[in-house]
């Protein structure tokens, strides 16, 4: 239980690293990526895994939190993931934090 609390407190720092990486993605030696990998390696030792979500994957409320919808005329895209705005994580197979996603909604 103490590990879970500590890890939850650390997730915003991982989010900040993700944001920094996205803003510096074209730099050759991005130190933020090294820091992120090191932090994820530590988390992995305690059973933390990133929830993998692919673009156009069907929305799954057991792993995702829909924070917004994107209207589309394509009915095949309805309820599929448009974008991941915040990564989700599991701890020993249980959701620690749901991934925040934008989901298509057919008009």
What does each model-identified segment do?
Residues 14-107:
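Structured alpha/beta interaction-core segments
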Residues 1-11:
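Charge-rich, N-proximal long alpha-helical rod segments
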């Amino acid at each position: 239980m103490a590990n879970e609390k500590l890890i939850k407190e650390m997730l915003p720092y991982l989010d900040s690293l993700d944001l920094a990486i996205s803003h510096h993605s074209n730099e050759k030696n991005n130190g933020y990526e090294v820091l992120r990998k090191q932090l994820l390696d530590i988390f992995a030792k305690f059973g933390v895994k990133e929830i993998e979500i692919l673009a156009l994957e069907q929305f799954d409320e057991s792993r995702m939190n829909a924070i917004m919808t994107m209207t589309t005329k394509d009915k095949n895209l309805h309820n599929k993931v448009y974008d991941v705005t915040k990564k989700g994580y599991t701890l020993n197979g249980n959701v620690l934090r749901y991934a925040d996603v934008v989901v298509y909604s057919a008009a």
